[in-house]
Amino acid sequence: MTEKIILPSPAKLNLFLYITNKRADGYHELQTLFQFLDFGDDISLEVNESGEIELLNAIEGVAKEQNLIYRAAKLLQNHTACSKGAKIGVTKRLPMGGGVGGGSSNAATVLVGLNHFWQTGLSLEQLAELGLSLGADVPIFVRGFAAFAEGVGEKLVACQPRESWYVVLKPNVSISTAAVFQDPNLPRNTPKRTLSRLLSEEWTNDCEKVVRDHYFEVEDLIAELLQYATFRLTGTGACIFAEFESEAEAKAVFAHKPHNIFGFIAKGQNRSPLHQMLNLTTSPQ
């Protein structure tokens, strides 16, 4: 492969998030449902024989060694003793710090894409284990299926939630995930429920009230749009989303978003667009 190939690096949503326990080691146990979207960044890969990893558009102010895209490529290269190199570019559409998985998705697309085109032969499960060192959400994107997660997020079960249309908006604020989980008012004892029960109930997010109480940008945007749709938080934010049965309904509400707010319309995907493109199931071809 010498030509450049463009791979999708999709967004994700946490369709619900419940915190069921705070462990003695400080970690929170949760129940959450991840689903991919047909919207995201693009990663370009151009494989070569140089052995060098070259970033075509580095993030200003971020050292190469701290860039998740570069780290993912080097991790796979070192783990497999691969002698090949690559030029890697990214077209960013997802907001930084939005809670829609941009950085984790980028890292996963690089791992899966380079494993495929370098022909390093790791299974998706091996890649997921490798990717965990880059971030807790990276394995979700590597495995490539919508998933119900429990524990501290490490127990994953493939899931088939409805593939709805969504309006996703990014309030003009950055939210500290650590601060949210340290907040004394955060619910930490929501009763555990079975997946089948959760799928039949209305979904909420235990982090939402804390975030809305502390970040007026989130509270005001949700309140302003309430006359059109009910928006809720994904993860710890800052992005909020509303669910619709049709693209037309989503577009109608999207038209009412404030002009200074970034947002997009997307459809839920239970199989990652990346895995659809590369025709991946349980192991790379």
Swiss-Prot record:
Q: Tell me which InterPro entries the record gives.
A: GHMP_kinase_C_dom, GHMP_kinase_C_sf, GHMP_kinase_N_dom, IspE, Ribosomal_Su5_D2-typ_SF, Ribsml_uS5_D2-typ_fold_subgr
* Enzymatic reactions: 4-CDP-2-C-methyl-D-erythritol + ATP = 4-CDP-2-C-methyl-D-erythritol 2-phosphate + ADP + H(+)
Q: Which residues bind ATP?
A: 95-105
**Which Pfam families does the record associate with it?**
GHMP_kinases_C, GHMP_kinases_N
Q: Give its E.C. classification number.
A: 2.7.1.148
Does the record's keyword annotation contain Cytoplasm?
Answer: no
Q: Name one GO molecular function term.
A: ATP binding
Instruction: Name the domain of life.
Output: Bacteria
GO biological process per UniProt: isopentenyl diphosphate biosynthetic process, methylerythritol 4-phosphate pathway; terpenoid biosynthetic process
Q: Which keywords appear in this protein's UniProt record, sorted alphabetically?
A: ATP-binding, Isoprene biosynthesis, Kinase, Nucleotide-binding, Transferase
Pathway given for this chain reads: Isoprenoid biosynthesis; isopentenyl diphosphate biosynthesis via DXP pathway; isopentenyl diphosphate from 1-deoxy-D-xylulose 5-phosphate: step 3/6
Q: Which residues form the active site?
A: 12, 137
Q: Which Gene3D superfamilies match?
A: 3.30.230.10, GHMP kinase, C-terminal domain (3.30.70.890)
Give the protein's biological function.
Catalyzes the phosphorylation of the position 2 hydroxy group of 4-diphosphocytidyl-2C-methyl-D-erythritol.
Query: Which family, according to the similarity comment?
Result: Belongs to the GHMP kinase family. IspE subfamily.
Protein name from the UniProt record: 4-diphosphocytidyl-2-C-methyl-D-erythritol kinase
According to its UniProt entry, this protein's organism is Actinobacillus pleuropneumoniae serotype 5b (strain L20)
- Provide the gene name from the record: ispE
